[in-house]
């Protein structure tokens, strides 16, 4: 991804940095509308998720996370922008006439061929079971449950690593640093997700943030005591507590929120790093 830096000709473009324009011309049979009503509110109209609202209308692109078109070669026809994720998507034309969207692997260009199945070449963009991959392979779009489709390492620039295979399980190191076990029969896609420079983007102004459906975030220390536990005081006062808390009084910044009795607790060999 090429980052385009704006000149400081106007306040709205000062310090702005966006990626190069990637057009989006989705196929009608691969998109459908979304019903965004409330934006962070429940059925009674009460805010349940803060900092959401507004935003441009979007059409959802149907992404093939399962990659269940086995042993049929497909060709990358377009690389498109997707407003629902940071990663780009590719339109694939398969040999049997079917057309599907997949996540854009890093380095893939228009005209490349991909395939999914067992014993397929270890090539960027190909999807195959973990049992057929050599150790050290960089992968993304990893299944947790066989046949459910990829659920791990799908964000822009995400990549996991296959570090061991023993018995019926494979050991993966995920982008978060977590090391966990997954069935060797689960599938994954070879390579890294594209658009790795997305973290270098700078929106440059508040209006661009509003287009994404994100409302302003206000610090609790500048609120009144009735609105936040950190609020109140004369001038720039400290929070008045030993440790920071959420707006509802629960400990924040460091407290573990994962449930202790999850089914996957025995599958995680090393928890993700902060």
UniProtKB/Swiss-Prot annotation:
GO (cellular component) term, any one: mitochondrial large ribosomal subunit
Region feature (Disordered): 1-22, 225-254
Keyword entries, A-Z: Chloroplast, Plastid, Ribonucleoprotein, Ribosomal protein
Name of the featured protein: Large ribosomal subunit protein uL2c
Principal subcellular localisation of the protein: plastid
Family that this chain belongs to: Belongs to the universal ribosomal protein uL2 family.
InterPro entries for the chain: NA-bd_OB-fold, Rib_uL2_dom2, Ribosomal_uL2, Ribosomal_uL2_bac/org-type, Ribosomal_uL2_C, Ribosomal_uL2_CS, Ribosomal_uL2_dom3, Ribosomal_uL2_RNA-bd_dom
Keyword presence, Glycosyltransferase: no
């Amino acid at each position: 991804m090429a980052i385009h830096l704006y000149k400081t000709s106007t306040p709205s473009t000062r310090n702005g940095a966006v990626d190069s324009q990637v057009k989006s011309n989705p196929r009608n049979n691969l998109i459908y509308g979304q019903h965004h009503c409330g934006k962070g509110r429940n059925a009674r109209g009460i805010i349940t998720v803060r900092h959401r609202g507004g935003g441009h209308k979007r059409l959802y692109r149907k992404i093939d996370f399962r990659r269940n078109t086995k042993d049929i070669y497909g060709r990358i026809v377009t690389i498109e922008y997707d407003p629902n994720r940071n990663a780009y998507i590719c339109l694939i034309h398969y040999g049997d006439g079917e057309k599907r969207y997949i996540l854009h692997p890093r380095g893939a260009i228009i005209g490349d061929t991909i395939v999914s199945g067992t014993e397929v070449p270890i090539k960027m963009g190909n999807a195959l079971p973990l049992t057929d991959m050599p150790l050290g392979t960089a992968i993304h779009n990893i299944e947790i449950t066989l046949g459910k489709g990829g659920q791990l390492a799908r964000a822009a620039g995400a990549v996991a690593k296959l570090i061991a295979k023993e018995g019926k399980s494979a050991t993966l190191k995920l982008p978060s640093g977590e090391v966990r076990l997954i069935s060797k029969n689960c599938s994954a896609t070879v390579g890294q997700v594209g658009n790795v420079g997305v973290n270098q983007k700078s929106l440059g102004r508040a209006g661009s943030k509003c287009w994404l459906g994100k409302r302003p975030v206000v610090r609790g220390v500048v609120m009144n005591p009735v609105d936040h536990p950190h609020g109140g005081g004369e001038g720039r006062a400290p929070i008045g507590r030993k440790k920071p808390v959420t707006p509802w009084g629960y400990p924040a910044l460091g407290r573990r929120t994962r449930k202790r009795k999850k089914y996957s607790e025995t599958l995680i060999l090393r928890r993700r790093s902060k």
